[in-house]
């Protein structure tokens, strides 16, 4: 055992809301689908030296289970069905689905197994990696420093928004996966609760314990998996959008637009989808350009943009959120999800730019071709070419 062997995680609900939302949809629609996912560090950090400590934490995760009070709380939410929650009660993480190794200094992690199970690994595992690395690298950093940084930011925020009508400004905590620690995230969220514009968190455990609204719908993996689930690649994005509405016909209706670029998404997002979904989420590319495209698309379809919500969640901080609010607030409803810049903002601490992304579904490749080339992920060049052709995409620069 290492000196840092105490478990990082204490609750199965210490994860992002959209993981449970997607897991229920997978449970009902794609019970037998198998997937594989891989870890990526987008920065230059050599994290392989932490492999043993991370492997210990993975083993510890098998002891997490849904507690009775957590089950009761989930049961009271409007979108979970009894069959899924009863299954979730019996769910346990299976460490055999995870391989962790030190590949010449690089951290190598691969997940594989039934999608209904593998889907829950990503967020808590990233939170574990982030917290373990920061325990080693920054043992002197603490919660008080994180809170001081936030207080200074809130002073600047007040000055920045003086005289601005903030009644349509809505901020959410999206900071679980790259947080400095569980304790820092909870402290930051508790402080933000004092602000009228703070509306919720993506973390189900915090939402339950702090009586907050849990926030989240679906992630890239929902669209990626449909690239192999759908018999027609060109129709896969529409199939993903339709399947989501089958599971959630009138709630959790914010659609993620950049699995295969915003332009390709809008070509698939016709009047029925645009009417039924409550809005769209931005996660790559220029946010102003994206928002203008979204508003123009709604107007072209004869839909009032004021009846829809745009959610911005790509590398945001408070200043960027205010800039976007100034630009768009008179034309559309807005929400802003901030992650790392809230939950890992401590002097002399370098946040990790880490992800875990789907790479296979039923043994075949899947891809993410976002509006930021550096966020593109796929091993199989032939499949990327097929995807570009199916969605009539221009050439996309090579990315990590």
Curated annotation (Swiss-Prot):
Positions of modified residues (Phosphohistidine): 220
Keywords associated with the record: Ligase, Phosphoprotein, Pyridine nucleotide biosynthesis
GO MF annotation, one: nicotinate phosphoribosyltransferase activity
UniProt catalytic activity: nicotinate + 5-phospho-alpha-D-ribose 1-diphosphate + ATP + H2O = nicotinate beta-D-ribonucleotide + ADP + phosphate + diphosphate
Gene Ontology cellular component terms for the protein in this record: cytosol
Biological process annotations from GO: NAD biosynthetic process via the salvage pathway
Pathway membership: Cofactor biosynthesis; NAD(+) biosynthesis; nicotinate D-ribonucleotide from nicotinate: step 1/1
InterPro entries tied to this protein: N/Namide_PRibTrfase, NAPRTase_N, Nic_PRibTrfase, Nic_PRibTrfase-Fam, Nicotinate_pribotase-like_C
Catalytic EC class: ligase
EC number: 6.3.4.21
PTM info: Transiently phosphorylated on a His residue during the reaction cycle. Phosphorylation strongly increases the affinity for substrates and increases the rate of nicotinate D-ribonucleotide production. Dephosphorylation regenerates the low-affinity form of the enzyme, leading to product release.
Keyword match Chloroplast: no
Role, per record: Catalyzes the synthesis of beta-nicotinate D-ribonucleotide from nicotinate and 5-phospho-D-ribose 1-phosphate at the expense of ATP.
Family per record: Belongs to the NAPRTase family.
PANTHER family in the cross-refs: NICOTINATE PHOSPHORIBOSYLTRANSFERASE
Name the record gives this protein: Nicotinate phosphoribosyltransferase
Organism expressing this protein natively: Escherichia coli O45:K1 (strain S88 / ExPEC)
């Amino acid at each position: 055992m290492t000196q840092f062997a105490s478990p990082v995680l204490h609750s199965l609900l210490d994860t992002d809301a959209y993981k449970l939302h997607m897991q229920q949809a997978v449970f009902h629609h794609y019970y037998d689908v198998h997937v594989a996912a891989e870890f990526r560090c987008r920065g230059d950090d050599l994290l392989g030296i932490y492999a043993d400590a991370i492997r210990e934490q993975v083993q510890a995760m098998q002891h997490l289970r849904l507690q009775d009070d957590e089950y009761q709380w989930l049961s009271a939410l409007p979108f979970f069905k009894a069959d899924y929650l009863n299954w979730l009660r019996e769910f346990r993480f299976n460490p055999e689905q995870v391989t962790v190794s030190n590949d010449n200094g690089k951290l190598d992690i691969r997940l594989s197994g039934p999608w209904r199970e593998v889907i829950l690994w990503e967020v808590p595992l990233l939170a574990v990696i982030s917290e373990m690395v920061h325990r080693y690298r920054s043992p002197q950093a603490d919660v008080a420093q994180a809170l001081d940084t936030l207080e200074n930011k809130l002073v600047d925020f007040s000055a920045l928004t003086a005289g601005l009508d903030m009644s349509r400004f809505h901020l959410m905590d999206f900071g679980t996966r790259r947080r400095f620690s569980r304790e820092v995230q909870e402290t930051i969220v508790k402080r933000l609760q004092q602000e009228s514009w703070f509306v919720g968190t993506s973390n189900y455990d915090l939402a339950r314990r702090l009586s907050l609204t849990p926030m989240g719908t679906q992630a890239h993996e929902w669209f990626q998996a449909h690239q192999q689930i759908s018999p027609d690649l060109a129709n896969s994005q529409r199939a993903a959008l339709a399947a989501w509405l089958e599971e959630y016909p009138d709630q959790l209706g914010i659609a993620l637009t950049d699995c295969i670029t915003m332009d390709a998404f809008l070509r698939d997002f016709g009047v029925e989808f645009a009417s039924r979904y409550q809005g769209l989420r931005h996660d790559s590319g220029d946010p102003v350009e994206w928002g203008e495209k979204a508003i123009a698309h709604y107007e072209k379809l004869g839909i009032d943009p004021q009846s829809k919500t745009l959610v911005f969640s790509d590398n945001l901080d408070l200043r960027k959120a205010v800039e976007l609010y100034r630009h768009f607030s008179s034309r559309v409803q807005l929400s802003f999800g901030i992650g790392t810049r809230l939950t890992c903002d401590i002097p002399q601490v370098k946040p990790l730019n880490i992800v875990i992304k789907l790479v296979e579904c039923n043994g075949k490749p899947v891809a993410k071709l976002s509006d930021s080339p550096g966020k593109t992920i796929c091993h199989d060049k032939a499949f990327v070419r097929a995807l570009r052709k199916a969605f009539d995409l221009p050439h996309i620069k090579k990315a990590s």
